[in-house]
Amino acid sequence: MKAGTACVALALCACHEAPSRRASGASNLVLITVDTLRADHVGTYGYARARTPALDALAARGTTFERAYAAAPITLASHATLLSGRYPPGHGARDNGMRASESVATLATVLGASGFRTAAFVAAFPLDHQFGLARGFDVYGDRLPRMPNGQPSNERPAAEVINDAIAWLHTINNQQSTISNLHFFLWVHLFEPHAPYGDPASGRSVIDRYDDEIATADREIARLLDALAEVRDRTLVVAAGDHGEAFGEHGEYAHSIFVYDTTLRVPLIMSGPGIHEGARVQAPVTLADVAPTAAHAVGAAMADVDGIDLAPALGGGALPARELYAESFAPLVEFGWAPLRALRTDTWKLVAAPKPELFDIERDPREERNRAGDERSAVQNLTDRVNRYSAADLPTPSSLDRETALRLRALGYASGSAIANQPSIANHQSPITNRPDPKDRREVAARIAQVTSGELTGPALLSALEGIVRDDPRNGQARLRLAYARLQAGDCARAEPEFHAAAATGLPSADIYLGLATCFGRRNDLAAAERALDEARRLEPDNPTVVANIGILRSAKGDQPGAIAALRSALAADPALNEARFNLALAYARSGRRSEAAATARELLARLPVNALQRTEVERLLRAVQ
């Protein structure tokens, strides 16, 4: 252990008092979530090729839950359940891009109100503070680095997350002289195993690259646990995956669509005072159990939760028989297909869908034989019960700003475009029967996973998108992606009709008309480009990218004052729009306002990373106006 880390740990250990408030001897809580981590790729779960010594050592010091399940196979919904103890219908964040309800208590709000210092450090944009999980945290570290083009990244390395977490421990340690009874709740979220896994051009298999990223996350977990070693006897550590990952099982790749156990089963390990070491719990549990269990362990309580306190199992006892709920609303929210809901009992697992599936999970743990046709009474009984879980209102997702939608899309999520502004999502009982069953769209879903994984480029990417559109012609998001892929390949003649086809699906996206404006501009049809931008602005009047493109068009038409006004307005709304800043400098130069052009170009150079591709062009402009 490094000397500085040891000092932090020893000092924190010395500060802990007030044993009366602790139910298990723990006065601190550390929650570690690893995105997209399958249980069967962790050593303690029997994976022969595992490279997870830190997680395995944590399991040896604590209790491993053999059958732990996420409530949703997607990042935001699963984490909202984990932090609140509520299933997705209860917290409202049922897909990425939605927002967790402010009325729902979380570990952070409960422990913060009890005097705990609270901090979270997350690694990816789906957990950005705007989506509602930052409530109750004194510090919510969601700042992501910028890419070479100056735009914000959508994720950051595990090492940066752990560095921030350890730095926060230093901070609260340095403040110990003013804190009489120090208790802390620290949550760290690591994104490494999420696609894309490493470099697809490396020649290594997808599984090998996935395991490489798990190993990276595990090394950083080891660093954090080392920093906490001296407070181990007073700290509950919970490590969990948020959901799994599919590699072809059931025809699925990646996650978010289906609710098979390949994407729902996750590792869940708890270690701390009063917890049996090396114990293994066979009873099925849900991530909704984490919040009530952790709160109780540190002397607090979570009210109005769907999960239960797992304290009996942590002490070697039994858990009651019960049923567990899970859902995926991504098929509806992202593609307009039927949502999927699952209910697990000791014997059965129902997947409620237009074509329901029923699995005997004791005899058929891989969910390979659908018994729905043979067990109709069980299907009806479980369907009635699953409907009770998902009876809560589902807020209609608000239209996301373009940057948010693009950042979610870059991580493989279509971000609500399929059903935006359709109130029927709030009553999701009816859409189940009159929408496509995701099972009947397996090949489309597999191609979508390929497209969003980062594994495909060039002609292979175009071919996959063409296959999606051929098999699912009403998929507006796929048509939009195909249109942009053709546009980027320089094929405006084929991109333009695809943009129109995307609009015909009812997709309410300004991106359609931004793409059309680009096509029209390339053939110098400025009047058509202006009409397209007017439609984009009608759809998204406050979208700074739309306003910036209006400014660029005005400059091309010779209206430099109008261009300057629009570009300045766009930059006031979003200072990160580097292309708008460059075009503002051009408009100043074309107006003869050389000093303002030079100042704008210098400001842009200061914002661009040293290795940004645009620097040469900006430097050329600066030389011309000086």
Regions found by a protein language model. Give the residues of each.
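Bacterial N-terminal signal peptides
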Residues: 2-13
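Catalytic domains that recognize anionic headgroups
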Residues: 12-492, 497-500, 504-518, 522, ...
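Canonical positions in the second alpha-helix
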Residues: 467-468, 501-502, 535-536, 569-570, ...
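Boundary/linker segments of alpha-helical solenoid repeat arrays
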Residues: 476, 507-511, 544-545, 578-579, ...
